[in-house]
């Protein structure tokens, strides 16, 4: 579905209203946003395709309790800017723990550091893909021409050649991609990285940066949790990651420090305070019971959380309970 609008805030408002109408009064809504694009950077986020290697850009978020994530919005530019919105043909989402979880800490790394990076591998049960019918997406045009001051597209290199200072300005159509998780993502409290990828027929999607530290209308991180900078890798660098600002852009005079970036995204859903504990025998039954109580029935829960069916919600719970 292709939609034309002028501002990301409108898309986000509609997203929140749609969820809110389906929620009972006692359900606590979850919403996180890094805010609006700052025009400083566009970083490649690309599904693999013939002649083009996979490139992943990831930024972090935190949860203070078990949460069902139903929707996400990402903002970027399509290059070249002559492409129609229909050229956005595929979106995939992966989530990562923070290193050293899910990582081989005995191998020799080929980057300056892995501290505070995404893990080597994704949380397999949290991957969502339209080919697996676990997400759907729609695209909204925000600005027919948006320019970023710098970009990272091809210059993603192992140490000691990681410093490129970026690849210069890029212009393209600014778009918001709204992602609906038809199999919602359920996660326990924790610190995670969100990694979307986009396939653009005949072009690329450059994920737009947002201010770091977060400023309004973005939402702050929970007390005691550090907002980490964005990281990137391509298939050649995998399983390592590079810091986009510190490692790749670096210090560009007259600046005396390297920039750091957030990426422009938001997440929406609901907390489930009485959910079960992953790995425990009663996790599935306890979580389903908690959802049924919270939403006055499991069918209502599936509707409120954006699941395409009760079976898909059951699948979400099974993935959560058996990571």
Located regions from the model:
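Bacterial N-terminal signal peptides that target proteins for export
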Residues: 2-11
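Non-catalytic, beta-strand-enriched accessory regions in extracellular/secretory proteins
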Residues: 48-61
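PGST-rich, cysteine-poor low-complexity/disordered linker and tail segments that act as flexible spacers
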Residues: 213-271
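Soluble extracellular-acting proteins and domains
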Residues: 271-323
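Aromatic- and Gly/Pro-enriched, solvent-exposed loop/edge beta-strand patches characteristic
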Residues: 54, 78, 84-226
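Extended extracellular/luminal ectodomain segments enriched in beta-structured repeat modules
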Residues: 64-73, 189
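Boundary/junction segments of secreted and surface-exposed precursor proteins
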Residues: 24-50, 270-291
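Bacterial N-terminal signal peptides
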Residues: 11-20
């Amino acid at each position: 579905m292709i939609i034309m609008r002028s501002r990301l805030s409108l898309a986000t408002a509609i997203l929140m209203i749609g969820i809110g109408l389906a929620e009972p009064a006692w359900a606590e809504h979850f919403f996180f946003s890094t805010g609006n694009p700052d025009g400083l950077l566009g970083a490649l986020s690309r599904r693999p395709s013939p002649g083009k290697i996979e490139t992943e850009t990831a930024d972090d978020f935190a949860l203070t309790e078990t949460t069902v994530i139903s929707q996400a919005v990402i903002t970027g530019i399509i290059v070249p800017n002559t492409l129609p919105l229909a050229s956005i043909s595929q979106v995939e989402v992966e989530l990562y723990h923070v290193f050293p979880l899910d990582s081989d800490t005995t191998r020799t790394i080929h980057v300056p550091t892995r501290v505070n990076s995404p893990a080597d591998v994704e949380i397999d049960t949290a991957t969502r893909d339209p080919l697996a019918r676990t997400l759907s997406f729609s695209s909204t045009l925000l600005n027919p021409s948006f320019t970023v001051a710098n970009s990272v597209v091809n210059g993603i290199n192992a140490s000691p050649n990681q410093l490129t200072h970026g690849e210069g300005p890029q212009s393209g159509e600014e778009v918001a991609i709204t992602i609906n998780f038809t199999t919602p993502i359920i996660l326990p409290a924790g610190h995670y990285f969100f990694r979307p990828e986009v396939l653009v027929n005949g072009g690329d999607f450059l994920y737009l940066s947002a201010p770091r530290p977060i400023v309004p209308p973005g939402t702050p991180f929970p007390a005691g949790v550090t907002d980490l900078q964005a990281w990137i890798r391509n298939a050649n660098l995998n399983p390592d990651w590079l810091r986009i600002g510190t490692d790749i852009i670096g210090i560009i005079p007259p600046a005396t420090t390297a920039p750091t970036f957030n990426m422009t995204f938001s997440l929406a859903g609901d907390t489930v305070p009485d959910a079960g504990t992953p790995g425990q025998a009663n996790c599935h039954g306890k979580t389903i019971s908690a959802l049924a109580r919270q939403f006055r029935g499991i069918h209502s829960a599936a509707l409120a959380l954006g699941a395409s069916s009760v079976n898909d919600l059951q699948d979400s719970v099974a993935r959560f309970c058996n990571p």
